[in-house]
Amino acid sequence: MTIGQSCFDRAIALFDAANGEDPRMDKGPDGKDVPRELLYAQRMTDMIGRFAPTAPEAAQLAVRAQHIQRWKVPRDSYPMDRDGYLQWRTGLYKFHAETAGRLMKEAGYDDATIDRVKQAVGKRGLKVNADTQLLEDVADLVFIEHYMLGFAGQKPDYTEEK
């Protein structure tokens, strides 16, 4: 095992332990309850493996950390309007990036790799940063495959155009 691989394995284990604390549960592929953000992270990793199997390590880490401990920043902690939603999303980007960076430091990663992952998770440089764009592409594919129908079912006022 290389030094990088051992850091990678430690970081994934730390991300999974953090997401394993999620009190909200969803059904996993075997029908058993799985902490929601842990399941999401696993789905993200599965998708990047299918969509971009040779993705750089930083991108693989970023997709695993995309929603790390998301439940700690509830939507209703911001105003329940469009501006509040945008503030919540921006706050989440920073929260996820900082949390991922802290755990990566604990796993033994260097500052350059941590910064690269934080940029992607923090949604910086979308359309010009390949890691950020790949993260967004993978998130879109995961949404389509696992969440779109449920989301649409909760939004009967959404038209096809919307």
Question: Which positions does each model-derived feature cover?
Answer:
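A broad detector of short, well-ordered amphipathic alpha-helices
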Residues: 9, 60, 94-98
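Histidine/acidic-rich helix-loop-helix segments that form or flank divalent-metal centers
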Residues: 63, 110-154
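Sequence termini and other peripheral, non-core segments
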Residues: 1-6
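Alpha-helical phosphate/pyrophosphate-handling elements in metalloenzyme active cores
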Residues: 31-59, 100-107, 112-115
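Structural motif
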Residues: 36, 52-57, 129-136, 157
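Divalent-cation-assisted or electrostatically stabilized phosphate/pyrophosphate-binding catalytic cores
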Residues: 78-99, 155-162
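Active-site flanking loop/helix segments enriched in acidic
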Residues: 7-45, 78-87, 91
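His-Asp-centered metal-binding catalytic motifs of divalent-metal-dependent phosphohydrolases/nucleases
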Residues: 57-76, 80, 100, 119-125, ...
